């Protein structure tokens, strides 16, 4: 019995001749190495279908092209190599290649005061494209932090002042009595509302960047905000966190401005878009602010 040739339907001519901007696969599971860590990732891989007469692309070739990422540290050079493989395997079909890598970056973070430390998760997307021989990389990073409302803090202070007047009016002030009052719920009758907040960073990298500056960008963002969420803590750390929140009262507008100024000084960034989301505990809606920056060309 003669062996039959397997049909290749994708090689047939399209019934409607029309180019497509993007064709590929989303949610491909694969391991990647970032800063020495082997992490589980999901990849979106695709190419343009510029030959409108071709019915489809060769998706298996894209899948195999991702194998180069299994043993090497994720870098702009590796991303470009993979994208070039996509194009080489689709010669005469595609002029542009695209790749998104979705990961949860794990960084070990120390406590504020005690010797404790713990792992913290940062959702990251690394996006790369090679189009008309022009290579480009973008990063999306989510950074969680705490925000305490300045207005709520002022209102709480006013209530405490009023309670002080009510409790000590026409009384001689004794240091011990005032100290005890300040440490009691009778004295501190109100506290400002705080909420867990998120900074969504979308950054365009310079062409000359050799490494993905994930950790340095996260460090710059957290330093600018001053209230990064914590991992393992003792009471001393929780107290230090309360102090940090009190010293860094922030509307969403304040957070967006802090991040804008901080990221301008981060090396390797040509432009960025910042979106901060304060999941209000006072309201059932979020407070949101956005900011853009683009380096001026010399």
Curated annotation (Swiss-Prot):
GO terms for molecular function: GTP cyclohydrolase I activity. Pfam families: GCHY-1 (PF02649). GO terms for biological process: tetrahydrofolate biosynthetic process. The record marks 149 as: May be catalytically important. It catalyses: GTP + H2O = 7,8-dihydroneopterin 3'-triphosphate + formate + H(+). Its EC number is 3.5.4.16. Pathway: Cofactor biosynthesis; 7,8-dihydroneopterin triphosphate biosynthesis; 7,8-dihydroneopterin triphosphate from GTP: step 1/1. InterPro entries: GTP_cyclohydrolase_FolE2, GTP_cyclohydrolase_FolE2/MptA. The keyword Transit peptide does not apply. It is an enzyme of class 3 (hydrolase). Gene3D superfamilies: Urate Oxidase. Keywords: Hydrolase. HAMAP family: GTP_cyclohydrol_B. NCBIfam families: PRK13674.1-1. Converts GTP to 7,8-dihydroneopterin triphosphate. Belongs to the GTP cyclohydrolase IV family. This is GTP cyclohydrolase FolE2.
